[in-house]
Design a protein with these regions (language model features):
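Conserved core segment of the aminotransferase class I/II
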Residues: 238-279
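Active-site pre-lysine segment of PLP-dependent enzymes
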Residues: 169-179, 191-214, 218-249
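Short, Lys/Arg-enriched N-terminal segments with co-localized hydrophobic residues
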Residues: 10-21
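Short acidic capping loops at alpha-helix termini that bridge into adjacent secondary structure
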Residues: 57-58, 108-112, 132-135, 179, ...
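PLP-dependent aminotransferase-like
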Residues: 128-185
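Structural scaffold positions in well-ordered secondary structure
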Residues: 62, 183, 217-219, 245, ...
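N-terminal small-domain helix-loop-helix segment of the aminotransferase-like
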Residues: 23-119, 124
Length: 279
């Protein structure tokens, strides 16, 4: 019968595979991955609530700095409207959003790049700058993703001891060497919440050698009443090795949308666009 024939053929194939004498070798993974730990995210809130036997709405996840107020009702309405087009691929270039952001910050659209949260921007920095002969400079209590991404590309992280849980800018400046490709400063800092004096930060940025990318992570800058205006520096082109990172995850309450953006020189944005996935 057809069933018996199929069964016989399947058995023949199984025997052939069993009789194959293959030398199994491990995949040639990048050696530096051996020392790179897998990132361990926090447990789902639903699981924590179930384990503790408490209502879901009584669980607050502090580690991710999520906005407890949630998104604007207008944003919710816009997302509901967008869901009607979920069968279509989105505009990967984010044409209209880039136009709006450019108008807001008085920049050219070519000076703005959209990303899957600011986390993806950090990875693009790795793609365009880092290798196993390079290093980055970070503060002791920095955002964990900076050194993780550096390790992904085989680069070293030069970690400068903190001063009162904040950035020792002079120490970070001294740590820069010929192999340094990027320096990261989050202001306000995540996770310690410290703030670098605006004038001190301006001086620091101006002193970094031109071969080193200065990354100012401004994920929380909208919470400041009187923030230093580094967008003006990007606008003027005075320091072409400057990248500002922003996100819609924090003050706008849109963490689930995974939307961030960078502001930089047109040449740096063009380089990152080359490694940005179109879909």
């Amino acid at each position: 019968s057809p069933c018996q024939c199929w069964g016989n053929r399947r058995q023949d194939h199984t025997l052939k595979f069993k009789n194959l004498k293959m030398e199994h070798k491990a995949l040639p993974l990048h050696a530096h991955l051996a020392s790179l730990p897998v990132y361990q995210p926090g447990r789902p809130l639903e699981e924590v609530a179930r384990e503790l036997g408490i209502p879901f709405d009584r669980v607050t996840k502090l580690a991710s700095n999520e906005n407890p107020l949630g998104p604007s009702p207008k944003a919710v309405m816009a997302m509901k409207k967008a869901a009607e087009s979920a069968h279509l691929y989105p505009d990967g270039n984010g044409y209209y959003l880039k136009e709006k952001l450019a108008a807001l910050h008085q920049l050219e659209p070519s000076q703005i790049i959209l990303s899957n949260g600011s986390n993806e921007l950090i990875e693009w920095i790795g793609h365009v700058l880092l290798d196993n002969r390079s290093n980055i400079v970070v503060s002791q209590y920095c955002f964990a993703i900076y050194p993780i991404v550096a390790a992904m590309f085989g680069a070293q992280s030069k970690i400068v001891p903190a001063t009162d849980f904040g950035h020792d800018l002079e120490g970070m400046l001294q740590a820069v060497d010929a192999s340094t490709k990027a320096v990261f400063v989050a202001n306000p800092n995540n996770p310690t919440g410290t703030l670098v004096n605006a004038e001190a930060l301006r001086t620091f940025v101006s002193q970094i050698p031109s071969h080193v990318l200065v990354v100012l992570d401004e994920a929380y800058v909208e919470y400041l009443e009187d923030a230093a205006d580094f967008v003006e520096v990007v606008r003027s082109g005075a320091i072409p090795n400057l990248l500002l990172m922003r996100t819609f995850s924090k003050i706008y309450g849109l963490a689930g949308c995974r939307l961030g953006y960078g502001m930089a020189s047109t040449s740096l944005v063009a380089a990152m666009e080359k490694v940005r996935q179109p879909f």
